């Protein structure tokens, strides 16, 4: 490989690293809302998986404790799935056009 080619690869790697850092910061600051019970329970979570807010519909206050616990858990799980999907989508859009070896996934 020629020196110019190696320098180009190094520059490309540095640019990719900068893009990855920016993407990770954007994801960390993003907020998603997970829901369950047809919207009766909603959980707002950051990309860092920090729960910022839980909203319960007033009609749930008469429900059995176990039902409420299940709905909250389902809403949290929904939020986590949305964060993971957003991360996969951003990574895929960022790496589109890159020729990665088969089976190689980012972030490493």
UniProtKB/Swiss-Prot annotation:
<comment type="subunit">
    <text>Homodimer.</text>
</comment>
<dbReference type="GO" id="GO:0003677">
    <property type="term" value="F:DNA binding"/>
</dbReference>
<dbReference type="Pfam" id="PF02575">
    <property type="entry name" value="YbaB_DNA_bd"/>
</dbReference>
<dbReference type="GO" id="GO:0043590">
    <property type="term" value="C:bacterial nucleoid"/>
</dbReference>
<dbReference type="GO" id="GO:0005829">
    <property type="term" value="C:cytosol"/>
</dbReference>
<dbReference type="InterPro" id="IPR036894">
    <property type="entry name" value="YbaB-like_sf"/>
</dbReference>
<comment type="function">
    <text>Binds to DNA and alters its conformation. May be involved in regulation of gene expression, nucleoid organization and DNA protection.</text>
</comment>
<comment type="similarity">
    <text>Belongs to the YbaB/EbfC family.</text>
</comment>
<feature type="region of interest" description="Disordered">
    <location>
        <begin position="85"/>
        <end position="108"/>
    </location>
</feature>
<dbReference type="InterPro" id="IPR004401">
    <property type="entry name" value="YbaB/EbfC"/>
</dbReference>
<keyword id="KW-0238">DNA-binding</keyword>
<keyword id="KW-0963">Cytoplasm</keyword>
<protein>
    <recommendedName>
        <fullName>Nucleoid-associated protein PSPTO_3645</fullName>
    </recommendedName>
</protein>
<feature type="compositionally biased region" description="Polar residues">
    <location>
        <begin position="85"/>
        <end position="96"/>
    </location>
</feature>
